[in-house]
Design a protein with these regions (language model features):
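Alpha-helical scaffold segments that flank or form the walls of functional sites
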Residues: 22, 50-51, 66-131, 152-159
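Histidine/acidic-residue-rich, glycine-tolerant segments that coordinate divalent metal ions
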Residues: 112-233, 246, 250-252, 276-279
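Active-site metal-binding motif and surrounding structural segment of the metallo-beta-lactamase
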Residues: 35-52, 183
Length: 347
């Protein structure tokens, strides 16, 4: 049994003084007590700062950790996608596994206890299974030539806390997108409005449209009119859904999706990644005004210098510390459907 205290503790979305948290040998909170002063309490471990729940990284690509520093900044959205394809074949499996293990350790030592991790294969699953962190792995279907999600479903069936997800609203044809959206119970995690190019694609212009046209790739989903309309038309209203980035989301997009879903989607912001790729920032003030549920992710070391929740918190503008900490803890747990056991300090 341990008794732990700090200058402040995050309790029910507020910073409180005089809090002592008791935990058992398994790390489960057994009691929370309040005191006028904790200076003279016996057997209390005191840590300067703020006592918060374990952080929840609501969007990560751990498998891309081997690309730390491999892709230049400011490539732009389409340029970054092309660079990933160009460099990812230059590394051995051993290098990929080692890099994932290092990044996993970095997250744990920073205070991350659960991660929504996006995967394309099972290579680093042993790293996640050995980890102290609880990983929820979503195997993404990606590519306009992808016709079925059988591989993603088969991989997910092998593991606990695993499912399939569409990569985005711009990289997957209609049939397979709908197939995934209507199968399984794990949350979907969809890259959403990371750049203006996504909306432009639906109007047949911009860098994505130009790239696809050069490659001879056709899109059978442009009739939806916009990324938000595609999600509202394709994803069941009762499916837990995470929308990642949202840098170019509008109030109209948020309102449409709030109206569609029984439980509004969680918008996961990855500000360091957005600055690294395109120099843009997510519209956090608009999301807050629209009553959106906001969580935080690190994205990958291909698109950021750090795999750090703290760094991403520091990059969020115009919000209070308590809001930022709530995004990094409780709201991430809500995104993963684990708020009954993670993301808050309570018995």
């Amino acid at each position: 049994m341990r008794k732990i205290a700090s200058h402040y503790a995050l309790i029910n979305g507020a910073l409180e003084r005089g809090i002592v948290v008791e935990v058992d040998d398994h790390g489960t909170i057994t009691d929370i007590t309040r005191h006028d002063t904790i200076d003279n309490l016996a057997s209390v471990e005191f840590y300067p700062g703020i006592l918060i729940p374990g952080m929840i990284n609501a969007h990560c690509h751990l498998e891309l950790s081997y690309l730390r520093g491999a892709i230049a900044e400011a490539t732009g959205f389409a340029g970054f996608a092309r660079e990933i394809g160009r460099v990812r074949g230059n590394y051995t499996n051993e290098e990929r596994i080692h890099a994932a293990s290092v990044a996993d350790s970095e997250m744990w030592h920073e205070g991350v206890e659960a991660v929504c991790d996006i995967a394309n294969d099972t290579l680093i699953m042993p790293v996640k299974e050995r980890s102290k962190i609880e990983y929820h792995t979503l195997f993404e279907a990606f590519g306009l030539l992808t016709e079925k999600a059988d591989a993603q479903f088969a991989m997910a069936a092998q593991y606990r806390h695993a499912g399939a997800t569409p990569h985005s609203t711009y990289s997957l044809q209609d049939g397979v997108f709908r197939e995934i959206a209507n199968s399984g119970s794990e949350p979907l995690s969809i890259h959403m409005l990371e750049s203006d190019d996504e909306t432009a694609l639906y109007n047949k212009y911009g860098s994505l449209w130009d790239w696809y046209s050069r490659m001879g790739w056709e899109c059978d989903f442009l009739h939806y009119g916009s990324p938000a309309q595609r999600i509202a038309s394709s994803v069941p209203a009762d499916r837990p859904t995470i929308l990642v980035h949202g840098c170019k989301a509008t109030a109209k997009d948020v309102a449409l999706l709030n109206d569609h879903f029984h439980r509004p989607p969680v918008w996961v912001l990855c500000p360091e990644s957005n600055r690294y790729i395109s120099g843009i920032t997510p519209p956090i003030s608009m999301l807050r005004e629209m009553g959106a549920t906001i969580a935080i992710g690190t994205d990958s070391l291909a698109s950021a210098r750090h795999i750090s929740m703290v760094k991403n918190i520091q990059l969020l503008d115009d919000i209070t510390l308590t809001n930022a900490l709530t995004y990094a803890t409780l709201n991430g747990a809500k995104a993963l459907g684990i708020a009954d056991r993670k993301g808050s300090i309570e018995v």
